[in-house]
Amino acid sequence: MKAYNKLSAVLLLSAGAFCHQALADNAVFTSMDDPSTAKKPFEGSAAAGYLAQTGNTTSSSLTAQTNMTWYQSSMAYSLWGNAANTSSNDERSSETYNIGGRSRYNLNSYDYLFGQASWLSDRFNGYDSRDVLTAGYGRQILNGPVHSLRAEFGPGVRYDDYHAGGHQTKALGYGAVSYQWQLTDTTKFVQGVSVLSSFGEDTTVNSETGLQVAINSHFALKLAYNVSWNNHPAESAPERTDTKTSVMLSYAM
């Protein structure tokens, strides 16, 4: 049994997905969607990670995500989605679904306009649904083969449907920074941070730190650490900070 538990731990670290808590709001768009540097009209990826443990404790965790971007001469359109759930002793302990869409229009080599919409369901953190719509201006600060950096901001609106009952609509300010560093031909570092704030009692900060290591031309190992902080969380899930660590196998379309 001890040997089996050690093997389970190794499998957990090498091929699984695990989390401290489900994220209440984890939509951070980190893909560099600049149409001026696109090498092909479509880029996409799908990734998944799974963990299962049996014995004295029975648990499972599944994480899956996809991201797709279509390019034109000065426009880019993106769709993304992710799902994660965790069960322990045949009881569901977290369940999160998130989908979103985005468009970008380049005004010139550095300036662009964007629009972005997302939907989140995370009942274990108090939300049957959370809908966010934002639009605004962005600046492509770096766009080289090694370093890519963009910053964007604009107004937004969010609709929250609480799992415990009730709903609320808020006007928000949105800001985000996304950075990519091509460390080697096969290794890429990604960092993204977004902020949604009502400039009062409700502010949400999302962060994603990732490392992607290519196995071959199609498959890669993707490691990610997500943090979500909300200074005014739902009453049914009072923790302000949620984290998620994942290890996934990614396939490039």
Residue ranges and their predicted role:
Residues 42, 73-79, 110-113, 145-149, ...:
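Repeated loop/turn-to-beta-strand initiation elements of outer-membrane beta-barrel proteins
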Residues 36-52, 74-79:
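Transmembrane beta-strand segments of Gram-negative outer membrane beta-barrel proteins
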Residues 1-40, 253:
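Cleavable N-terminal export/targeting peptides
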